[in-house]
Amino acid sequence: MEVNFVTNRIEIAPTTRHEGHAKLILEVDEEGIVNKAYYLNTTPVRGFETMLKGKPAEFAPIAVMRICGICQTTHGIASCEAIENAIDCEVPDDGLLLRELVGIGNRLHSHPLHHLLTIDDFLKPDETDLKIELIKLIQRMRKVGQLVVDIVGGEGIHPPNIVIGGMRTNITERAKSRLYYALRQYEKDAYELYEKYTELIERYLEEIGIPDLGAHEYPYIATHTTYGDRYAINWDDVTEIPAQRYYDDEEAKQTTTIQIPLYAGVPAEGGPRARMVKFGNFREGGSAMDINIARAQENLGAVYRALEILDELDLNGKTRAEVEYKDGFGIGVHEAPRATNTHMAEVGKDGKIKSYRIIAASTWNFPIVEKAIEGYPQQYAEVIMRAYDICASCATHVIVKDEETKEIIEVRKML
């Protein structure tokens, strides 16, 4: 941590226990309260949107799954959904069920990974036995999530069964039985983790004496509990602006590698709490630590839905539609573990990508993290940040410049 005592400016670089590379710049008053926060993505831009132009549409889901090794499944699903929407391709019911299931598997792995990265925020140094117990519990859960992706998706890291038109293949009766048994064990572990993890968070808030730590007044964005719904968002209200136009701080303008999505002109929180508020009875507007609790609750809802899918799935059902390309523009939405993940594709009748846009899940939460930190003591800034389970690799974005002036020029309306 670097402190400038003249300007009361604190830099935490890098921030830790999340995916990717980022840093926090905090402007604090004499009492250490954060007046202004900048949460800056320092992960290099890879340029996936530009890379896809002119490529065969089938390459898109394969490529975008390489954006991130944790969020690969959600990118593959959102990409396929966007292209299918562009060409009016209707995925068979069993293909959609399998696609939802593989996405849930990703969540069943990703959420516990976040719990693993955050337990040190709430455990005391002498609680070694409890820490070991929780780690073992979490690792069992992660293995089940990866098992679901491996069996349904065909591979645990970049699942090849997620294809345009649906899913490449169905699962067998033996695979179904194996998944059912594993998910039943996950259900027990998830409930145990929820109880113990929630107790730790509630104790932490009581001990620091800030029950509303990280609270903010910004809206939530979510489209579905376990899949995604492109019609749940008014796309006329979604804009994406360069960070250079969003920030008033020169270092922030020059450092961050994201663009800022806004909903109705303001930042919006996505992710577990947003989904639980929109589609459940979760409390609204509380501490950022509520996001950790909502994430633990989502483990339970996700595993229940996974078991339902196994009951609904026809193992002899068709899982993939015929694909015929035509000129079109489509939107694909999937509720990633961290927030709403959106891919937009313009496709030609030759089956090639004309243009491609991505608003990855964590992109929504970068500006929200800043708002959540402001007004609270600086020593809790990373704890608040970690509650959002940021994936910095996903949030990196293309930078659009004027070829002559080299100035950032683009403000993107989504439609």
Swiss-Prot record:
Quaternary data: Heterocomplex of the form (alpha(1)beta(1)gamma(1))(8).
EC code: 1.12.98.1
Enzyme class: oxidoreductase
Chain sites annotated for binding Ni(2+): C68, C71, C391, C394
Names of the cofactor(s): Ni(2+); iron-sulfur cluster; FAD
Function: Reduces the physiological low-potential two-electron acceptor coenzyme F420, and the artificial one-electron acceptor methylviologen.
Protein name: Coenzyme F420 hydrogenase subunit alpha
UniProt xrefs under InterPro entries: Coenz_F420_hydrogenase_asu, Ni-dep_hyd_lsu, Ni-dep_hyd_lsu_Ni_BS, NiFe-Hase_large
Entry keyword Transmembrane: no
A Gene Ontology molecular function term of the record: flavin adenine dinucleotide binding
Database matches in SUPFAM superfamilies: HydB/Nqo4-like
Cofactor binding comment, as recorded: There are 12-13 Fe atoms/(alpha(1)beta(1)gamma(1)) unit of the FRH.
Reactions catalysed according to its record: oxidized coenzyme F420-(gamma-L-Glu)(n) + H2 + H(+) = reduced coenzyme F420-(gamma-L-Glu)(n)
